[in-house]
Regions:
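Elongated, mostly alpha-helical coiled-coil "stalk/stator" tethers of large membrane protein machines
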Residues: 1-52, 56-81
Length: 81
């Protein structure tokens, strides 16, 4: 698991999503090992439903629009075969 190999995880979320995501902080925290620093921060540059995971190794865009595009791509690939 990539998150277990990193020293820190920061979840950057939009202002409209901050309250909802913060309410899930303990559940999200339980997904990483105890030695990893975990934080959730509000990012004014993000729009609603946008979310970025930052570690000391990489940045992952897990925004809803990105996930939907990936889903569409997967469905297209399945129907081409």
């Amino acid at each position: 698991n990539q998150l277990e190999k990193t020293k820190s995880v920061t979840l950057r979320v939009s202002k409209p999503d901050m309250l909802t995501v913060s309410a899930q902080k303990e559940e999200l925290r339980s997904c990483v090992s105890g030695e990893v620093d975990f934080d959730i921060t509000e990012d004014d540059s993000l729009h609603e439903n946008q979310c970025i995971i930052e570690t000391d190794q990489r940045i992952i865009d897990c925004s809803l629009d990105v996930q939907l595009q990936n889903l569409k791509d997967q469905i297209r690939m399945l129907t081409i075969m």
